Amino acid sequence: MKFIVLTDTHFVPHGETLFGGDPRARLDSAVQNIRDEHGDAEFVLITGDLTHRGEMGAYHSLQQSLAGLNLPVHLMMGNHDDRECLLKVIPSVMADANGFVQFTIETPELRLICLDTAVPGTSAGHLCRDRLDFLDCELGQSSNGTKVMLALHHPPFDVGIPSLDAIRLLDSRGLEEVLDAHRSPEFIFFGHVHRAVQGLWQGLPYRIQKGINHQVALDFSLSTEIPLSFESPEFSIVTLRENGHLVIHTCDFLYNGPLFTSRHKEHQSVF
């Protein structure tokens, strides 16, 4: 089975721009690529920061763009989002009994548990007891025959970019304790960082991917401001194969340069 993961769309109301870029145009391009190349996917997941300022008009524009997909779409919260506006504009968004945008995506092969780490008034992430209890319950319902994955907006660790490390998930101990009490998820997806980062945390493999509208520049020294850029965006194509093999490709969906083969005369010495 296959699914698609995007993050950090940072929508503004239709017709507006953000940092001189057009989030709607970029997501529309991603939607077109997914329609053309990945119509066999089970679902699409967006791991938070759906909008930049949490405006209702921005959620309306996001909803219009995503209507171009003939696939189920699951939306998560990020620190730039407004929970009340999101649920009002897009009532199909799943929330738990406490009103947090938390849910589990289930297929015969997979349980993907999606957590809400957003806290109004701060860019950093937090998991309160209610949210951790949700995770504890969902992990407890996972059978040994099904792959378990986890998705959060905020990573619970430093990535080495000081301006972002200051606004990560600040209370990771509670998350660690819940995970230690269960069979661990086999993979974790994060957003928030606006860079392609992968590694191991607590022995668990994870992936962070680039955002849709803009990226964070690769600056390991600046701590007072978050340096931004318009490096190319991407989305992830996640495939689970019958033998349990997990494969993740990234799609640079805005690339429109030439395609050639290793037999191309000018490139024979390179390949």
Task: Indicate where each model-derived feature is located.
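Active-site environment of divalent metal-dependent phosphoester hydrolases
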Residues: 12-15, 52-57, 79-87, 120-123, ...
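Short glycine-enriched, charge-decorated loop/helix-capping segments at active-site entrances
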Residues: 16-22, 91, 121, 161-168, ...
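Active-site-proximal beta-strand elements of phosphoester/diester hydrolases
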Residues: 1-13, 109-119, 149-152, 204-210, ...
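His/acidic metal-ligating clusters that form di-metal
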Residues: 30-43, 125-207, 234-237, 246-247, ...
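N-terminal active-site segment of His-dependent metallophosphoesterases
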Residues: 1-61, 65-68
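Extended active-site neighborhood of metal-dependent phosphoesterases/phosphodiesterases
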Residues: 56-144, 174-177, 181-184, 202, ...
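Acidic, His/Gly-rich catalytic cores of divalent-metal-dependent hydrolytic chemistry
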Residues: 208-271
